[in-house]
């Protein structure tokens, strides 16, 4: 059996790409930051310590998920035509990586908000490359 040569521009079918994963993970980072902020200032019990440890672990895992999702889309999906139309995508992707790292390193809620805003802009650009209209809504 002879296999014909095939060509593809990415590792997986493009239909798999969706920045929604990064958006959900970024929102989760903010939620975990909020929950960490609600913890008592002084941890007295093993139960509270275990809870805080789990919250921090989950915050960090979701920040990593943001980075993985954005890196995959940026590295595998964006090609020259999209980059020409949206030249900010390189700086934005790098900024998302740095902001996600800040979220891992600290518990400042503003870092989480910044991450959500940057990931939302990334998603907006992604969908614009597919000529899909998006809209932004403020939460209540």
Task: Outline where the language-model segments fall.
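N-terminal intrinsically disordered, cationic/polar leader segments
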Residues: 1-53, 82, 87-119, 125-140
């Amino acid at each position: 059996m002879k296999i014909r040569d095939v060509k593809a521009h990415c590792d997986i079918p493009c239909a798999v790409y969706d920045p929604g994963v990064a958006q959900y993970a970024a929102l989760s980072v903010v939620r975990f930051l909020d929950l960490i902020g609600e913890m008592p200032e002084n941890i007295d019990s093993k139960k509270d310590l275990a809870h805080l440890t789990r919250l921090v672990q989950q915050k960090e895992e979701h920040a990593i998920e943001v980075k993985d999702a954005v890196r995959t889309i940026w590295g595998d999906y964006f090609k020259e035509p999209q980059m020409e139309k949206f030249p900010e995508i390189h700086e934005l992707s790098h900024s998302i990586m740095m902001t996600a790292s800040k979220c891992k390193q600290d518990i400042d809620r503003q870092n989480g908000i910044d991450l959500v805003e940057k990931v939302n802009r990334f998603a907006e650009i992604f969908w614009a490359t597919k000529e899909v209209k998006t809209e932004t809504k403020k939460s209540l």
